[in-house]
C-alpha cells in the first residue's frame, strides 16, 4: 500500500510491518506525508490505526521498516523531530487534580513555550468561565477541549491526533476542522483517526490510508 505526492515531504514510512499478539496488522506499508496534508488513518477496530499513529510518532517501534523525518530516520534526529511533533492520544492526558488553566499551562511549558495567554487560548475552545474548574469536575466534552487547547498555541509542523473529535459537539468538530485546514495551509500536516464524519474538510482535501488486519 503506497500513498505519495510531489509536495515537500515531511514524513516517510518505509515498508512498515506491525505485529501485535501474533496478528499482522499491516505489512510493507509505505507512504509519504507532505507539508499541507490532512491524512486520515481508517480501518475497522483492531486494524492498527492507533499502532500506526504511535509508530509514526516514535512512541512504538515497528516489527520492520522505518519512519523518516525530512529524509532521516526519526531515531537519529529525535530532538528535532520531537520539537516539531504534537501528539495527542485517544486519552485526553489531562490531570484531573489540576484546573483547565493549570493543565494548559503545564502542557505548553513542558513543550517549551513561555509566552502565552491561557485565558485567551481557553476562550478559543469555548472554556471561558471554566479556567479555574478542576478538570475532574468538567464534562467529557470540556475535558477533551482542555486537551485540545494546546493546538491553539503550537508551532509544531506535525500534528498526530488519535480520535480528536471524541465527546466534541458538531460546532466544536467544525471549529477543529477549520483549525486543521489553517495548520495545513501554513505548511504543517495533520494525521488523525476518527469515527466521525467531517463536514468542513472535503474528500478532495483529505488523504486516506486504509488498514485491514489479517492473522499470521
Curated annotation (Swiss-Prot):
Enzyme class, spelled out: translocase
Residue ranges occupied by any ABC transporter domain in the UniProt entry: 11-216
Major subcellular location class: membrane
InterPro entries named in the record: AAA+_ATPase, ABC_transporter-like_ATP-bd, ABC_transptr_haem_export_CcmA, P-loop_NTPase
Intracellular or extracellular location(s): Cell inner membrane
Function of the molecule: Part of the ABC transporter complex CcmAB involved in the biogenesis of c-type cytochromes; once thought to export heme, this seems not to be the case, but its exact role is uncertain. Responsible for energy coupling to the transport system.
Protein name: Cytochrome c biogenesis ATP-binding export protein CcmA
Amino acid at each position: 500500500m503506497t500513498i505519495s505526492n510531489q509536495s515537500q515531504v515531511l514524513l516517510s514510512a518505509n515498508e512498515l510491518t506491525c505485529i501485535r499478539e501474533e496478528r499482522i496488522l499491516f505489512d510493507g506499508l509505505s507512504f509519504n506525508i507532505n507539508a499541507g496534508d490532512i491524512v486520515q488513518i481508517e480501518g475497522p477496530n483492531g486494524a492498527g490505526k492507533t499502532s500506526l499513529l504511535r509508530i509514526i510518532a516514535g512512541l512504538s517501534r515497528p516489527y520492520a521498516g522505518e519512519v523518516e523525518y525530512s529524509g532521516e530516520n526519526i531515531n537519529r534526529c529525535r530532538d528535532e523531530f520531537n520539537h516539531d511533533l504534537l501528539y495527542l492520544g485517544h486519552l485526553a492526558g489531562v490531570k484531573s487534580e489540576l484546573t483547565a488553566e493549570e493543565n494548559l499551562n503545564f502542557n505548553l511549558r513542558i513543550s517549551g513555550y513561555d509566552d502565552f495567554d491561557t485565558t485567551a487560548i481557553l476562550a478559543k475552545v469555548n472554556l471561558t468561565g471554566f479556567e479555574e474548574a478542576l478538570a475532574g469536575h468538567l464534562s467529557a466534552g470540556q475535558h477533551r477541549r482542555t486537551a485540545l487547547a494546546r493546538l491553539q498555541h503550537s508551532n509544531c509542523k506535525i500534528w498526530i491526533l488519535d480520535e480528536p473529535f471524541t465527546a466534541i459537539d458538531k460546532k466544536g468538530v467544525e471549529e477543529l476542522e477549520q483549525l486543521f485546514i489553517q495548520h495545513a495551509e501554513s505548511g504543517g500536516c495533520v494525521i488523525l483517526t476518527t469515527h466521525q464524519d467531517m463536514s468542513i474538510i472535503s474528500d478532495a482535501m483529505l488523504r486516506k490510508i486504509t488498514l485491514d488486519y489479517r492473522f499470521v
